[in-house]
């Protein structure tokens, strides 16, 4: 894919609708080739650096397996495995790694960090997650949606995101809707809406591409006719305990449960989640939530919905690897 060669992958709005579609087509082909045993290694001899200032299961495994499948080698630099930002600036780190590696993945904090890496590295840089955007996740989501509704184009699909929409997932969903023409509905309390400027920009683009973007606090109105309902965690272990109570009180009414799924009026509605999910008390945080806030059946999603036939979250998780592979192949091979 010569049009992508040596490009960065930092946020979705850096691309056109046609470019996004070609990445999804490549991901689908790579997935089919892997499953049929016909995959051709395009990245043999390439060296890839994986910078993780925030730990991850899916992102790390996806990049590593995708790289190995394609014949590349990886170096993992974890939260304590480099001098980035401590003894060496991002700018200097970029210039060092760019001399040794063919591509660099960054998962961490501010978007300005991955932008600086891209400016100075001289090799493709990929955003594995920042505070502001999570573009590789949305690629996986879009591929999963295509697979489960093959008879519809994106501008015939309705995607609902319920919960805290002011985070990197909300922002990247706005950008995805802008490029694909999805009917995107962010169903959340006003305190959890994304920045107005990004909403305005993405809504205008979405409408040009045959879709729309709606923000509402009304759950029943927001989920009506949805093809997919998506949510993400409400709290994380790194946050102060006082924040937990505040966030849970704010978002309780936006939990994805069987009632919300029924309110769609669509018996075929599917459930999406970028994972990890607090749907039971089998994790340290899930157990704390159950004990302190009575959330025994799940937090942002009930265990009933998570384990139901409507849940396609593990298809999503698998597709992280196929779509990340597409990004690497597109940007590192001519």
From Swiss-Prot:
Pathway: Amino-acid biosynthesis; L-arginine biosynthesis; L-arginine from L-ornithine and carbamoyl phosphate: step 1/3. Signal peptide: none annotated. L-ornithine binds at residues 168, 232, 236-237. PANTHER family: ORNITHINE CARBAMOYLTRANSFERASE SUBUNIT F-RELATED, ORNITHINE CARBAMOYLTRANSFERASE, MITOCHONDRIAL. One of its GO terms (biological process) is arginine biosynthetic process via ornithine. Carbamoyl phosphate binds at residues 56-59, 83, 107, 134-137, 274-275, 320. It comes from Escherichia coli O45:K1 (strain S88 / ExPEC). Reversibly catalyzes the transfer of the carbamoyl group from carbamoyl phosphate (CP) to the N(epsilon) atom of ornithine (ORN) to produce L-citrulline. This is Ornithine carbamoyltransferase. Belongs to the aspartate/ornithine carbamoyltransferase superfamily. OTCase family. InterPro entries: Asp/Orn_carbamoyltranf_P-bd (IPR006132), Asp/Orn_carbamoylTrfase (IPR006130), Asp/Orn_carbamoylTrfase_sf (IPR036901), Asp_carbamoyltransf_Asp/Orn-bd (IPR006131), Orn/put_carbamltrans (IPR002292), OTCase_ArgI (IPR024904). Its EC number is 2.1.3.3. Keywords: Amino-acid biosynthesis, Arginine biosynthesis, Cytoplasm, Transferase. Its main location: cytoplasm. The lineage of its organism: Bacteria, Pseudomonadati, Pseudomonadota, Gammaproteobacteria, Enterobacterales.
